[in-house]
Amino acid sequence: IIRMEIKRAMRGFKDVTPTEAVQLINKQDAIMLDVRESNELSQGSIRDSKHLALSVLKQRVDELKTHAEKPIIAYCKTGNRSSAACEILKKNNFTNVMSLKGGIEGWKTANLPMVK
């Protein structure tokens, strides 16, 4: 358990719950970054989120530079790809990046609003 916590701390980003994400959106104008593939978007997404699939994020990361000062919360279906997205963002000098714990599934479980 301690080893997992050390590894998590060394990543340079943290996981946030859906409730924490809502607070960051409301108080700090956080950007929700949907890193799912296009064919997954029909399942719904978080309002006003920016879509950049993980498969193209490295090539298109500059599109996020205008948001570099804001918190960026990456999400996917369950939270695995969003961690990889956070690593890419950190390597490109984004400093305030987070991963949505549980992904869009966690968001749904928390009964938070979505758009189709």
Question: What are the residue ranges of the model-derived segments?
Answer:
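Rhodanese-like catalytic fold shared by cysteine-dependent sulfurtransferases
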Residues: 1-30, 38-71, 77-116
